[in-house]
A protein has these predicted regions:
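Structural preference for beta-strand elements that scaffold enzyme active sites
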Residues: 17-21, 58, 86-90, 111-113, ...
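Conserved, mostly hydrophobic/aromatic
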Residues: 23, 51, 59, 104, ...
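Conserved anion-binding
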Residues: 24-26, 30-31, 35, 109-197, ...
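Glycine-rich, proline-tolerant flexible connector loops at the mouths of alpha/beta enzymes
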Residues: 58-76, 116, 196-208
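Charged helix-capping and loop-helix junction motifs
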Residues: 72-79, 122, 177-181, 207-216
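Glycine/small-residue-rich loop that forms an oxyanion/phosphate-binding "nest" at active or ligand-binding sites
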Residues: 74-132
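Catalytic cores of alpha/beta
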Residues: 89-90, 95-108, 212-249
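C-terminal helical cap(s) of enzyme catalytic domains, especially alpha/beta-barrels
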Residues: 124-131, 241-251, 255-278
Length: 278
C-alpha cells in the first residue's frame, strides 16, 4: 500500500488534487449541513470504487461518529474499501493512539487522519511521525467563525464583522477555544505532513469554500493543505484554486448526488488553466 501512495504522490507534485470524501456513519456514506441534518448517500465500497475509476487523485474516508462514541474506525470496512481502489487512501475517525493509527494502516490506508485525538494530546502527532513517517500523518481541522472579539486570537474582518476561526472537535460538536490558524501551524511543527481543513460554516451548503480560512492556513504552514466544506459545483473548485495557494480540494455532495464524474470536474479545471492530472 505504501508504494502506491508514494508513486502517485510523486506524479502529483505540480498538479492540484481533486479528492472525494466519504463521511461514514454506521457503515453508510452520509452527508449533512454544518455537520448536522445527516442524510444517506450510499454504500462506501461502491462509491469508493466509482471514484477510483473516475479519476480521483485520492480518497478520504472519515468515520464521523467514532470520536464522539469513543471507539475506533471500523477496520473491516476500511479494508473492504482499500481492496477496490488504487489511489492514495486517507482514513480518519477515532484515532487517539499509536495503536489506533497502526490498525488503520494495517487495514489498507496510506495515511491516517487525526482530529480530536491530536487536540487532546498534541504529542501524539510527534509519536505518529516518528513511527510511521510524516507523510502518513494528516491533521484534520474543523473550523468555524467565532464572532466574539478576542485580542489573543488571529482576528479578521469581513463585511464589517470581526471574527476568528475556532477549532471544533468530536465531529464538530464541541468547541475548543483554539485558534484554527495557530493550531494548524502548531500541528505542522509537531509532525503533521498535511492539513485537511474543513469550514463548518460552509459544510453542505454548496456556497463555495471559505477562501479566507484556506489561504490564511496555507500562509501559516509549510505542509500541503486540503480545502474542504462548501463545494457545490465545479466553479467552486476553480475559485479555491484560483484565489488561494491550496494544494487540493475535497468534495462530497457534488460527487455523491450529481451525475458527474471526477474527471468531468477536472476537465473543467483544466479548461480554466488549473493544472490537474487527467
Amino acid at each position: 500500500m505504501r508504494a502506491r501512495f508514494q508513486s502517485r504522490r510523486q506524479s502529483n507534485l505540480l498538479t492540484k488534487r481533486v479528492i472525494p470524501c466519504l463521511d461514514v456513519d454506521n457503515g453508510r456514506v452520509v452527508k449533512g449541513l454544518h455537520f448536522e441534518s445527516i442524510t444517506d448517500a450510499g454504500d462506501p465500497v461502491e462509491l469508493a470504487s466509482k471514484y477510483s475509476r473516475d479519476g480521483a487523485d485520492e480518497l478520504v474516508f472519515l468515520d464521523i461518529t467514532a470520536s464522539q462514541e469513543k471507539r475506533g474506525t471500523t477496520r473491516e470496512l476500511v479494508s473492504d474499501v482499500a481492496k477496490v481502489i488504487d489511489i492514495p487512501f486517507t482514513v480518519g475517525g477515532g484515532v487517539g493512539s499509536v495503536d489506533d493509527a497502526r490498525d488503520i494502516l494495517l487495514s489498507g490506508a496510506d495515511k491516517v487522519g487525526v482530529n480530536t485525538g491530536a487536540v487532546n494530546n498534541p504529542a501524539l502527532l510527534t509519536e505518529l511521525m516518528g513511527i510511521f513517517g510524516k507523510q502518513c500523518v494528516v491533521v484534520a481541522i474543523d473550523a468555524k467563525r467565532n464572532h466574539s472579539e478576542d485580542s489573543t486570537k488571529t482576528m479578521f474582518e469581513e463585511d464589517g464583522k470581526k471574527f476568528w476561526f475556532e477549532v471544533f472537535i468530536y465531529g464538530g460538536r464541541r468547541s475548543t477555544g483554539l485558534d484554527a490558524i495557530r493550531w494548524a501551524k502548531e500541528a505542522a511543527a509537531l509532525g503533521a505532513g498535511e492539513i485537511l481543513l474543513t469550514s463548518i460554516d460552509r459544510d453542505g451548503t454548496g456556497d463555495g469554500y471559505d477562501v479566507l480560512l484556506t489561504q490564511k492556513t496555507v500562509d501559516a504552514v509549510s505542509v500541503p493543505v486540503i480545502a474542504s466544506g462548501g463545494c457545490g459545483r465545479p466553479e467552486d473548485m476553480c475559485e479555491i484554486f484560483q484565489r488561494s495557494d491550496v494544494d487540493a480540494a475535497l468534495a462530497a455532495s457534488i460527487f455523491h448526488y450529481e451525475d458527474r464524474s471526477v474527471n468531468w470536474v477536472k476537465e473543467i479545471l483544466r479548461d480554466r488553466g488549473i493544472p490537474v492530472r487527467l
